[in-house]
UniProtKB/Swiss-Prot annotation:
Protein name: Valine--tRNA ligase
Organism, scientific name: Janthinobacterium sp. (strain Marseille) (Minibacterium massiliensis)
Keyword set includes Nucleotide-binding: yes
Pfam families given in the database record: Anticodon_1, tRNA-synt_1, Val_tRNA-synt_C
Protein's GO biological process: valyl-tRNA aminoacylation
Motif mapping: 'KMSKS' region: 559-563
Cell location: Cytoplasm
Notes on the domains: ValRS has two distinct active sites: one for aminoacylation and one for editing. The misactivated threonine is translocated from the active site to the editing site. The C-terminal coiled-coil domain is crucial for aminoacylation activity.
Known catalytic reactions: tRNA(Val) + L-valine + ATP = L-valyl-tRNA(Val) + AMP + diphosphate
Classification lineage: Bacteria, Pseudomonadati, Pseudomonadota, Betaproteobacteria, Burkholderiales
Enzyme class, spelled out: ligase
General function of this protein: Catalyzes the attachment of valine to tRNA(Val). As ValRS can inadvertently accommodate and process structurally similar amino acids such as threonine, to avoid such errors, it has a 'posttransfer' editing activity that hydrolyzes mischarged Thr-tRNA(Val) in a tRNA-dependent manner.
Length: 965
């Protein structure tokens, strides 16, 4: 089959991604005779579209899957999508809003129907995009976290945890989004520094007494001046929450206030008194050293309140208005309107001492951008530190303890290992997990209430009624309206996708999975919870290795986000996009539409011509090249261009091989002799160069095997690039041209055999990283190599993955080739030094010290003539007397036989020597300047030293040439 003149990825990708799936090549088996390799796709939001982070981790996962599939493993890469409670509900609510309808107008049942309709229409968008990336999961196992099998598992797990006393309902402080009207997880809260204010407010002593407050100190820190006060000053960034204050805390070691601990204060604007308490939480150096304690509206205050048994007074409604627990003057006001009124009233009463600008971290909802409120609400929680009861896999240990043990004892390995510390730190400081959400879309909590509020947790309503009847209640039951946190169902994925609670063949074969590929930002939210739930319900760990990768940032190191307008869609990198379409994508749906103009400006500046189409393989190779363990990635589009060129290079190399091999005897007769086994003049006669490329191939195969074992895709990509581009294309193909043009028939057969065998092996080696181009090329190359059709199917992805054979490493051939390379480089350098036109072919003379060396040098002659563009190559006992420069390689001397205008050459060399002298003097002057060396970055100083060394080496060569003239 003739290859097209240039590599056009679009048609190849469209054909093969359909063909592979249609032929069933992705489908996993549970063959007991094969080792298992399984991997879970972190389920993307069903609402979502791909971003570069998906492109990155799916390149890694697919590379691992294809590699193990080719090595004969039962490979199960299990795909799925997440119902994404909040995200999905928001999308559908926005659609209704455009029709001037709210979800409350529809009612819960109709609204949920609408969400399912939307999911069925658009839920395949992201899986279609995953296919575009060349991903090869077993689509027959695709799941949705709210499909029937997963819902059944979620209910079963919830009921069992309640029965075991590990899920409870209670009133605790949670992150509350007042726009969405629900609790949200920490991951859905974005805290960024903003400009705010600090208000200093006077809280009067309730008994009207006064005390001496130090206002001046000597050098030793002793007070020297005091003033009489009948109040203390509290500093706060949220004056509206003072309506819920229940105490003021001071540092127990703070001598300014020690004597006041236990006294009562009058809470301004409220007819209440609150105590002064001592607590280590207070930093006496910050603000005034007095902290208002509002347990119902601050997480730290909540902890202080628990320690001191303080009341919790909630002063906000669920939509963030002042409620009935506050003075009537503020009831019904929005929290920020209340803030203004409270500050004005404090000022009017002479209680506002100071207002000053203050930078503070403000928590906002990632989807609504509203300020998140710590809110005291009734929620369901998983007990993270409570010992599990008898009858569970690890009785007497909490699910957190077990999760820590499984990493500590090595059953789960974290890569890089430093993430183990982060994992441990999070789990050692864990709080009970709030798992309820006040949404309509999600797994509705399987709990029913009787008329007196007693709860019955059950697998279905009939079971709940039976439990109520057994408890002596026969009235109506009302189901809990809350749904479960999306992370709850996600935490069950390792076993909910394998048939649990039944011990199915899948469950036995693929749990634990081999590796989890994930970003560090969800180690706690997802990874740790999967460990907890899987160990608790199956006794097994969910995975053996956790490969933690960094975040993908833009080329300047900025985090990619919609609000910054710097996100990149991997499909746009595959297909290309013009600048107008790119601007439109980046500016639609912004939370702050005012950002659109600046985003458009920066986008047009960075991509004036839009983004070129690079194809999937180039994008995947780029991702692999970035995949060093753990580091954040500054994504540079120019790398995609470089790796598109790499794909073109591989395509063109294959065309060259096919043009030189098709229709010829390529050395593949029955039972041909292996490389190196045939005598000269036999059927095949392998050269040193043939042996060299085969030897280098073995080393590359070994390096790549190590890269896969260590999850170092950056090393895999580097090994592939270096061998394919540098060794095979730049050197061996050029050598092969010489052998085909000048060799005997046996040498030509050996060359063609080597060209094809090495190329076919290259394609199999590179397939896990660049699947499309390797499949397309393999289909044309394999038939020429004597390939026998595979009963399982004729695809590269079903071929065995290459393994290094130590017996084929040939150090003698490697040394020979290293010498040829050095001589070629020497000739090219001589041409450069003499400023010869690339088109000018000149003779080369090489001096040999003895007949053995002469024979060896003669073996290089035909190659040097072609590689260095020489008219002829001669070996002599001694070089002729000539002003021409000489290069020494080992013990051999090389000279280009060229007539030289001595006067002109002396003048040229004089000018160049003077220039280099000047550069060295200038650089040494910098390095001799103590101020420069002290202030300049170490890298700049090192570069300057390197310049001096390079200039000096060149200068010495030029002076030698000048002396000869």
């Amino acid at each position: 089959m003739e290859l097209a003149k240039s590599f056009d990825p679009a048609d190849i990708e469209a054909f093969w991604r359909t063909e592979w799936e249609k032929r069933g090549y992705y489908t996993a088996t549970t063959d007991a005779d094969k080792p298992a390799f399984s991997i879970q796709l972190p389920p993307p939001n069903v609402t979502g579209t791909l971003h570069l982070g998906h492109g990155f981790n799916q390149t890694i996962m697919d590379g691992l899957t294809r590699y193990h599939r080719m090595r004969g493993f039962n490979t199960a890469w299990i795909p799925g999508t997440d119902h994404a409670g909040i995200a999905t509900q928001i999308v559908v609510e926005r659609q209704l809003d455009a029709q001037k309808i709210t979800r409350h107008d529809l009612g819960r049942e109709k609204f949920v129907e609408k969400v399912w309709e939307w999911k069925e229409k658009s839920g395949s968008t992201i899986t279609g995009q995953i296919r575009r990336l060349g991903a090869s999961p077993d689509w027959s196992r695709e799941y949705f976290t709210m499909d029937e099998p997963r819902s059944k598992t979620v209910t079963e797990v919830f009921v069992r945890l309640v029965e075991q006393g590990l899920i409870y309902r209670g009133k605790r402080l949670v992150n509350w989004d007042p726009v969405l009207g629900t609790a949200v997880s920490d991951l859905e809260v974005v805290s960024e520094e903003e400009d705010g204010q600090m208000w200093n407010i006077r809280y009067p002593l309730a008994d009207g007494s006064s005390y001496k407050f130090p206002i001046a100190f000597d050098e030793a820190g002793n007070a020297t001046e005091w003033e009489e006060r009948n109040f203390i000053v509290v500093a706060t960034t949220r004056p509206e929450t003072m309506l819920g204050d229940v105490a003021v805390a001071v540092d127990p070691t703070d001598t300014r206030y020690q004597h006041l601990v236990g006294k009562l204060l009058t809470l301004p604007l409220c007819e209440r008194t609150i105590p002064i308490i001592a607590d280590d939480y207070v930093d006496k150096e910050f603000g005034t050293g007095c902290v208002k304690i509002t347990p119902a509206h601050d997480f730290n205050d909540y902890a202080v309140g628990q320690r001191h048994n303080l009341d919790k007074i909630s002063i906000l409604t669920l939509d963030a208005k002042i409620n009935e627990n506050a003075p009537a003057a503020y009831q019904g006001l929005d929290r920020f309107a209340a803030r203004k009124q409270i500050v004005a009233d404090l000022d009017a009463q002479g209680l506002l001492e100071l207002v000053k600008p203050h930078k503070l971290m403000v928590p906002r909802g990632d989807r609504t951008n509203t300020v998140i409120e710590p809110m005291l609400t009734d929620q369901w929680f998983v007990a993270m530190s409570k010992p599990a009861p008898e009858g569970t896999y690890f009785p007497g240990k909490s699910i957190t303890e077990v999760a820590l043990e499984k990493v500590a004892n090595g059953e789960i390995k974290m890569l890089p290992e430093n993430w183990t510390n982060t994992y441990n730190q999070w789990l050692n400081n864990i709080q009970d997990w709030c798992i309820s959400r006040q949404l309509w879309w999600g797994h509705q909590i399987p709990a029913w209430y009787d008329s007196e509020g007693k709860v019955y947790v059950a697998r279905n309503e009939d079971e709940a009624k039976a439990k109520a009847t057994a408890a002596g209640y026969n009235g109506p039951l009302t189901r809990d309206e809350d749904v479960l946190d999306t992370w709850f169902s996600s935490a069950l994925v390792p076993f909910s996708t394998l048939g649990w609670p039944e011990e199915t063949p899948d469950f036995k074969t693929f749990l634990p999975s081999s590796v989890l590929v994930t970003g560090f930002d969800i180690i706690f939210f997802w990874v740790a919870r999967m460990v907890m739930m899987t160990t608790h319900f199956t006794g097994k760990v969910p995975f053996k290795t956790v490969y933690v990768h960094g975040l993908i940032r833009d080329s300047s190191g900025q985090k990619m986000s919609k609000s910054k307008g710097n996100t990149l869609d991997p499909i746009d990198l595959i297909d290309g996009i013009n600048v107008d379409e790119l601007v439109a994508k980046r500016t639609v749906g912004l939370m702050n539409p005012k950002q659109a103009a600046s985003i458009e400006k920066s986008t047009r500046k960075e991509f004036p011509a839009g983004i070129s189409a690079y194809g999937t393989d180039a994008l995947r190779f780029t991702m692999a090249s970035y995949a060093s363990l753990g580091r954040n990635i500054n994504f540079d589009l120019s790398r995609c261009e470089g790796y598109r060129n790499f794909c073109n290079k591989l395509w063109n190399a294959t065309r060259f091989v096919l043009m030189n091999c098709e229709g010829h005897d390529c050395g593949f007769r029955d039972a041909p002799c292996a490389a190196g086994d045939c005598d000269p003049g036999g059927y095949t006669d392998f050269s040193q160069a043939d042996r060299w490329i085969v030897s280098k191939l073995q080393r590359t195969e070994a390096d790549i095997a190590k890269g896969f074992a260590d999850y170092r895709f950056d090393n895999i990509a580097a090994s592939l690039y270096q061998f394919i581009w540098d060794e095979y294309c730049d050197w061996y193909l050029e050598v092969a041209k010489v052998q085909i043009q000048t060799g005997t028939e046996a040498q030509q057969r050996a060359t063609r055999r080597t060209l094809l065998r090495v190329l076919e092996t290259i394609l199999r080696l590179a397939h896990p990283v660049i699947p499309f181009i390797t499949e397309a090329l393999w289909q044309t190359v394999a038939p020429l190599t004597g390939y026998k059709p595979n009963p399982a199917g004729d695809s590269i992805m079903l071929q065995p993955y290459p393994e290094a054979q130590a017996g084929k490493i040939d150090e003698q051939a490697e040394n020979w080739m290293a010498e040829l390379k050095a001589m070629t480089d020497a000739c090219r350098n001589l041409r450069g030094e003499m400023q010869l036109s690339p088109a000018l072919r000149v003779p080369l003379i090489m001096e040999a010290s003895d007949p053995t060396q002469a024979a060896r040098l003669q073996s290089f002659a035909p190659y040097l003539q072609a590689l260095a563009k020489l008219s002829e190559v001669n070996v002599a006992d001694k070089l002729p007397e000539s002003p021409a420069p000489v290069s020494i390689v080992g013990t051999a001397k090389l000279m280009l036989k060229v007539e030289i205008d001595v006067a002109a050459e002396r003048e040229r060399l004089s000018k160049e020597i003077a220039r280099l002298d000047g550069e060295i003097t200038k650089a040494n002057s910098k390095l001799g300047n103590e101020s420069f060396v002290a202030r300049a970055p170490a890298q700049v100083v090192a570069q300057e030293k390197e310049r001096v060394a390079n200039f000096s080496a060149t200068l010495n060569k030029l002076r030698e040439q000048f002396a000869k003239l």
